[in-house]
Amino acid sequence: MIKIIEAAEIHFDMENLAELSFEFNPYPEEEIYDIIRQIQARFAKKYPRIRFSFGIQSFDNEVLTLSGRKSLFLGLVDFLRGLQPLKTDSTVFNFDFIAFGKRNTTKKGNRQLRNQSALTFFQNFVNSQFADSFSLYTLELFENQLWKKKNEKLISGEFFGTDEDIYEEFSLLKDILLDAGYSRYELSNFSLASKSSIHNRVYREMEDYIGI
C-alpha cells in the first residue's frame, strides 16, 4: 500500500494534499494494526491528516452472522481496544455502521433492537468520543440470481427489518450521534469539530482528489 502511494506521488502533484484516507474491514486485526503503524511512520510528518475508516457495521452478533461478517461482538471490542494506542493528533478514526432494522417487540410493546446490549455498547462507544467521526448507512438489498431464495427472504424483511424498521433504526442511531456531540455534515456522515472527512466533501463538490 505504501508503494502504491509512493507511485502516486511520482505521477500526481501531492504537495498540498490535505488528507490520506484508507478504508478497512476490522480483520485480520494484527495485520490492520501493522498497516496503520507503517502508514503513520511513513506519512505522518508529510501529510497533515491520515484518516482510517473501519467497516464495523453492527455490534449485534445475529446481524453480523446474517450479513456474512468475519468478526463478532467480542472480536470487535478487542479490535477497538487495539486501536487506542494508535490514535495520534494527526490520525482520524471513522467507523461505518449500517441500520439493518433488526428489531423485536418487548412485552411492554416497545420496539427496540433485537440485542439491547448491542445498542447500549454502541451508545457508550459513541459517548466516549474515541471516534472522530461516523458514517451511518441504511441497509440496501437487491435481487441476485445466485442466492435468489435467500435474497427474497432478505428483501421481504424476514431476516433483517422492513424499510420502515431500517429507517426507524437509522433515526435512533442518528440521534445517539447528535446527542453525543457529533455534527451531521453530510447525509450519512457525522463528526466532531474539525474532524469531518475532507475526501467526502471534496469529491461531492467535484474538487481534486486521487482515488486508488
PLM feature spans:
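Conserved non-cysteine loop/helix-boundary elements of the Radical SAM core domain that shape
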Residues: 1-175
